[in-house]
Structures are given as C-alpha cells and as structure tokens.
C-alpha cells in the first residue's frame, strides 16, 4: 500500500462541508473521492447541495499524466466481498480482528466514522477485548491484505501496513482497494510483534540497484570515446557523448565494466583516441540536452546535419537552421603519402551556412587546420583540434578566441576596447538575464520578490516566477548544492504559505455571510479581488513547477560533474534530488489547492443564480439576436454569464496557462449542467418549465448562453457538459400534439443523450404536469425495460468531472529567451538595485572605496581598458525602440558620477567551487547605483568628481532612426555601437553623457505629500525640457528612500511617459496619482545637479 498524506483544505463557512484532499505520492492515476451521493431533496436544500459541492471538489492532481482509475470507484449497493472489516448493510460498524492479541477470539466490533483516527480505534478495540485502554501505546492497528480462502481454510496474510496514530482507516479503506482476488481486514497487533517482523524483513536490494543505476547514468553522461583505428577493426566505433575537453578528462571505463569496476583507469586504446585523432570541441551550442562537447573525427568520412526520419548524420546538431545534410568532413590523403600527408577537408552543402574563422566558405572545400574555428549556422561554434599537426593552439587561433566579445554582467551589453573598431552585427549578443546575490541575503530577497507585484496592478503577472527562477538558476550555478537545496524548499514553502493565508482570509469573509445566501448578499464583484491573489499564485506556481521539473536535473548533473566532493558525494546529490522532488510536490499541492478553492467559491456563486434560469419570466423573443449590443440579456441569464465572464477575464489578466484555464472553465460548465439537469429531474412538475410555453423560454435561455460561450471561444466544453440538459429542455419545448405521436423508440433516437431511466422520469412527470393519462406509446420497450426503472440512474453524479492534468508545453517563463517583457526587466533592475541597498547596509563604513564589498556585481574583464555600450533604458511601450545611440549633442544632459576606489585595489571574483581569482580590471561603470549617492547638494565642496567610463547612452525619443543612430529597427536589449567617435574629454557636454542610469522608485504619499520639489528644466541654466528634482524635504518619503538626489529627472509617472508633456500636466499627473506612486527616474551628474539647483533670473 502506498503512503499517503491527508490535508484538510477548505476552511469553509459553517454550513458548507469541509472538503479534504488525498495526495498520492506514488499512485499512477488521479481520482476524485467522495463520501456522499445525491439524494432526494430535503427541507434544507442549500446545506445538502453545498455538501455535494464540497465533496465534488475533493480531488487530487499530479504533474505526471494520470487518468481516472476505475479501481477507485465507490462501492456498489451490495457488500464488497473484498472488505472483511466493514459491511454496507451495517454502516458505522468496524470489525477489528485480534487473533494475535487474544487467542480464540475472531474479531470485535467497534463503532467508527470517516473521521475516526487509528489511535482512538485501538483504544476502543482494546476495551472490547477486555484489555486496558491505557496500554494503547503497545498496540497498533494494521491494514492487512491477504486471501480469505474457502470455508474451513485459514486467513493467509500477504502484506500489511501499520496505520499512523492520526490516520483515518475508513477514509483510506474507501480510497485504496486490494487488487482482484485479495481481501482486506483491519487487525489489532502488538507493536513488539510488528517491530520484530520489520527487523527480519531487511531490504538488501534497493540500495544496490540504485547505486548501479547511478553508476550507469554517470557513464552514459560521460560517454564512451571512439577507439583508435586499430581497435576499431574489432569493434564498431562509438561517439564521444558528453565528454569534457582534453584538459580535464577523467578515466572512464567501458560500459560493461562500469558496474563492477567504476574506479579502474581507462584503457590506453580509449585515451589514445582523443589525443591522437582529430576532433571538434564545442564552444557554443544550441541544446544542452542533445549537444556533445567533443566530436571525434576517426572515420574516413563524417556527415554533419540535423537528424530527421530520412537523414541520420554521424554528427547530429539540433539547431533549427542546420540542414539535414549541412556539410561533410572527409579524410584526404596527399600525394606524398604517410600520416603527415593526411588532412581533413570540410565540404559545405549548397545553401548551408558554414564559416571558417568567421569567413564564409561558400561552396569551396576547405582544408582544416589545427585551431580553426567552425561556425555552423547561427548557433554552433566549434574548435578544430588535430593533435597530429601541432600540440599547442596556434597564436592566430588564440587571437581569434580572444576576439570574442566581452559582455557586461549587469545588462548583457557587449563591451569593446576603447578606440577599437565596431564589432560586426553578427557578433553582437543580446543582454543576458542575471540576478546575482549572496546566500546571506537570500531570505530578504525572497521576501521582497514575494511582495513585489500586486495582482490587481498593471505589471506582468508572472514577474515573481521569472525572478524566482533567476534565483534558482544563480544558486544552482554559483552556490553549494546544500544552499541550492534549501532555496528550493524555501521558495515552495513561501508560496504555499502565501496561498494558505489568502484562502484563510477569504474563508473568514465568507463565514460572515448570513444565510440563506442570495445573489444580493454574494455578488461576484466582491469575490473577484480575493480570487485574484489565489489565481495569481496558482499561475506563478505552474511556471515554477515546470521550471524546476525541467531544469533541476540538469543543474544537479552539472554540480556532480564540476564539484569535487569526497566521501558523501552520492548522498549529497541524493538529498538535492529529494529536495527538488519535495519542492515540486509542494508546488503541485499549491496548484491543486488554489484550483479547488477557486472552483469552490465560483460554484457557490453559480449555485445561487443558476436555479433562476428554470423559473425565468417571459421575454421578448424578437430581441434575441441583438443581445450582444444592448441590455437584451434577461437578468437571470446575465447573472450566470457575469460569473463565467468574470472568471474568464481573471484567468486572462493573471496570465493563467491556457490549458489550466480551460480546465477550470470546464469544471464550471460541468457543475452548472449537472445542477440544472438534476433540478429538472428532481423537482418535476413543480417547475414551470414543464408547461410548454415556459419550456420554450427556458430552452431559448440555454441557447443564448451557448451562443455566449461560442463567442468567448468556449463552445466545445459548454456543448459537451450541457448536452443532456439541452436534450431535456428540447423535449419540454416540443409541442404536446407532436410529443404524443412519438413512440418510445422514436423518443430514444430523438433524445439520445438521455438514458432510459431519465427519459422515463421526464415522460412520467410530463404526464403529471399536463394532467393527461398514461400514454401507451411511451411505455419502455423490452430492451430498455429493466434500465428504465432503475431509480439510481436518474440523477447525474458529481463524481465524474473533467480530469485535471498539468500542461507540458506553452509556458511563458524562459530564461534563455531572446527578449523579455519590459515590465519584467524593469522589476529585475529594481531587484538589482534593492540588492545594492542591502550591500550598502551590510557594510556602511566601507563606502565606495572598498570594491570588495560589492564583489560579484562587476564584470570580469581581461587586461585593458574597456568601455561598454549598453545598460539600456527599458521602455514600457513595446512598440517603441528601447535604446538608440545618438551623437553627444542630441542627448539630454543626464548622468551620474562613478564611485572611485582606491588606486591599486581591484576586486576579485570567486566562484562557488572556490576556484582561484586573479587581479582583474573591472568596468566600474556597470554598477547599478553609485554606492553613496548624496541626498543633498553641497556646492561649497572643493571640487566635483568627474565621471569616467561609459556603460550606456539612452535617448528618450521614440524614433527608430535618430540622428547618428543605426539604420533599421533596434531590438530591445541589443547593444548598439556609436555611428560617430566618442566626444573628446574636453567637450563641454561629454561629462554629462558618459553615464546614464535609470531606475524605478515607489513612493507612498505621506502627511506632507511626497516631499520633493520639481522644476521645469527650461527655467534653469540647464535649458533642457524635462521635469527635474530641485529640492528634497528632510524626513519625507522621497528623501527617506535614499536613491533620489537633486537634479534627477522624472521620466515616467505610474507608467505614463512625460516625454513632450507640459510642466503643469506632469504636476497634475503626480498630484492625482494616488497614495502609492511609481516613478521612472534618470540619475544626473553633478554638473547637471548644479544647474538644476538655480532658477533662471526673470528677463
């Protein structure tokens, strides 16, 4: 029997049944358990229906693909012979067998309910066996599966499971059934006997087979090198798969010997292959899953291409721009003969993109030389090495490798040497997305990310998932495995706690509603704000779950290959994998719980408004076709549509995965169709729709609803779950004279969705409502006679809802995407600045003069002065260019000073493995914020520090081709090169253009407002249009934030750009922007701040 975890979920109001969810850790299927079935109506109909609703929503979900398992269906009307401890004919009586406790006694009966715990049942059973209940700790209740045998034969137990003290035996009995041919009974056993049995049954195989699997997995990951030509004659050559370069090769035995001798040295024949045969070393690839690191060229001819059903190249590359046959590499023997005369010739195929040393080769064959760089398509870059030609790489090859562009680690922009020519467009890379932090600020960072986005705002709703995935990526690549493991568990726990708090608050609000609940006391508008938070974290949890599921094994494999741990290496990575599985299980639980809660409350809304559709007043049929353009929807139908429309809008606004959104709406359709059909079949003639005129009206109402569903793109699920109700209403809308002439067989063909029992029930109630005598033609025929009188088949069950399956594709969080949403990137910049603030608080005495305090946020650069062109201003308007480069005179005078460190001190950067780090020059202009930005301005200082270096130039206009800009559209995140040489240091405006830093700040209005005085730049010596900060009130929100300083320019207010906006209009936007406001601010240099401080004298 699989282990189980029982979680009580719904903190519902007192008159709504609390549902529970059973999460199966290893069950292959997903099922929905229930303890209630629908019965004829009672006086308290609302309470009964709520119980049905709650139990319908008790279900499980798995990120694996699962189908509904018929073995978990509820028991039938008769007693189940496989259950020896319970009988349906005697509910509430549990037989506890105690052969091993009291000799000569077969069993004792105790009373139990579904909520009875195993510990309490042990106490009751001991009392029935005349034993002391105080000794309950010496006994355990066991779930025993075995064969009862025929009469006279003894019970033969095959396996048993000990119940935990707080487990619910009857609930487990309902959900887990023994397989066919076996029976189950509950036994009372002594704990000492159970422990003795457990000590004898020692598992000696699991650890061995798992160790064997790990060894085989490591060998498969490292691959088996191809043999030399001598060895290849006796065995076919094999590809080197996922090896490492020749400088870090470790001995690896062949596959058959790996299981027995994993630590033996590699045979000389295999090592000789890589050190003597030419090979291609992968420098840049496309797919981590499919690319090899080394391709050994040991054959006479190699084909390079993309593997297809009709093409199977010897070197398979997976990039989309690789042709099925891209090029061939063949061995060419020169006329001189001998080994020295053997060369490899690259022969490109027509139409294939092939470059050697960054030069297109066209159709001409090329003789490969040791150290050549091969570019295949846009993604693959390989280094050709031929140990037979030369051992060290030639100087020209090293120069080409050194010419690869460096990138700023903060913004991903390409850096180039000062005065060097512009790089070709093909080499310019997009900015990388990184979020670097230290382990000591991990908790603070997670808390800030969790509270960063308001679900009701305009920000990208998947920003938390995106930022948390960046945290996971950084931790996996730079921290120890233990830190990575703890981070996964922290993230899953914080998400789970957040969802639980939001649902708890919603339940407390719902508990205050007075019964009976009506539409007036339970409006959808009041429910939407609370559902926003639940759906918000459900959407982010789905993205996080998929990311961890896909990336965590790759990260663990990378750690295993790179980290050198002795002794407990296997246990360390085993713990990491276990933590990854626990995090995925927790996130899966969040998705399930959030799904259940949302459907629960939405179904309550529908339960209130759906019955009115069956009792709707007359309506104007001639306006039926124009209901979209005016208030033609009747009030009863408008309420139902408003619930579905609000749900659809919420799912789209919160960027829920489309497959999960469709499943949630399918649930609501299923519930609505089942509820209305059961009411028609249950209430019968008491409903006005059984009279023909009202039946026509109700049928028309349903058609209007289906029309709305089709217009919203939900036609298929709506028609599926309303099919039986539609057949029922069409029958009631059929004229009486026409209906009387139909025979039973004709009715079965005309209304095929109804089973015989439901059709017979409808016809019987139709006769009562119409006061007409029995109609002989409506009597069930011989084939349908027995089924027509089965009363249990009349009402539809809530136990067969549409399945819930997590999606496997279509996710939006992709850290390797070419570009990212502007809103997400703005928040990434804010989080980086937030981390800067934390570093400043951690070392307030060090100041900017100690670069070691900000270690890890610099880009490591080789010897030489570099200047970067990047750090763009991420524009909120995706239709506009994010960054363009302009000549110096066209740039607004904005800038900021750089923090200068003491001479001779240079920061070093170490990685997670403690590798060596040398003294390196750093591009200090890549800092997101000067560590000490002054709040006020003191012009009496002796001198103003001049900025140096360059990390980006931003133009705030939206033209695609500004003066001096590059022709054509500029993609967001691309690094742009100057069309003109940089201005000389003596230029009056160069100091204001060398630095442009843009950040986001959120301020909450205080008693005295925001506390900053603004001025139009045209009325200052600056003479530039724009809104600038002239004064900061001490103690105000603006001053307390710590990032704003005099002279800073306000670019946006709550997402609205101030470009071209008048001063009065900009001030009005700030004055009426609400209590919490968000500003996009550009830092200014000291020269600009001095000019902003003074106003022009009146002319």
Swiss-Prot record:
Modified residues (Phosphoserine): 235, 245, 248, 250, 422, 432, 915
GO cellular component terms attached to this protein's record: microtubule; protein-containing complex
Domain FHA as annotated: residue spans: 302-377
TM regions (residue ranges): none
Domain PDZ: 1000-1085
Swiss-Prot/TrEMBL GO biological process terms: signal transduction; substrate adhesion-dependent cell spreading
Keyword vocabulary terms for this entry: Cell adhesion, Developmental protein, Phosphoprotein
CDD domains according to UniProt: Myo5p-like_CBD_Rasip1 (cd15472), PDZ_Radil-like (cd06690), RA_Radil_like (cd17116)
Keyword Phosphoprotein: yes
The organism's place on the tree of life at top rank: Eukaryota
Domain Ras-associating: 90-193
Domain Dilute residues, every copy: 525-792
Signal peptide region: none
SUPFAM superfamilies: PDZ domain-like, SMAD/FHA domain, Ubiquitin-like
Entry-linked InterPro entries: CBD_Rasip1/Radil, Dilute_dom, FHA_dom, PDZ, PDZ_sf, RA_dom, SMAD_FHA_dom_sf, Ubiquitin-like_domsf
Function: Downstream effector of Rap required for cell adhesion and migration of neural crest precursors during development.
Subunit structure: Interacts with RAP1A; in a GTP-dependent manner. Does not interact with members of the Ras family. Interacts (via PDZ domain) with KIF14; is recruited to the microtubule network restricting its interaction with activated RAP1A.
Family the UniProt entry places it in: Belongs to the RADIL family.
Name of this chain's protein: Ras-associating and dilute domain-containing protein
Gene this chain is encoded by: Radil
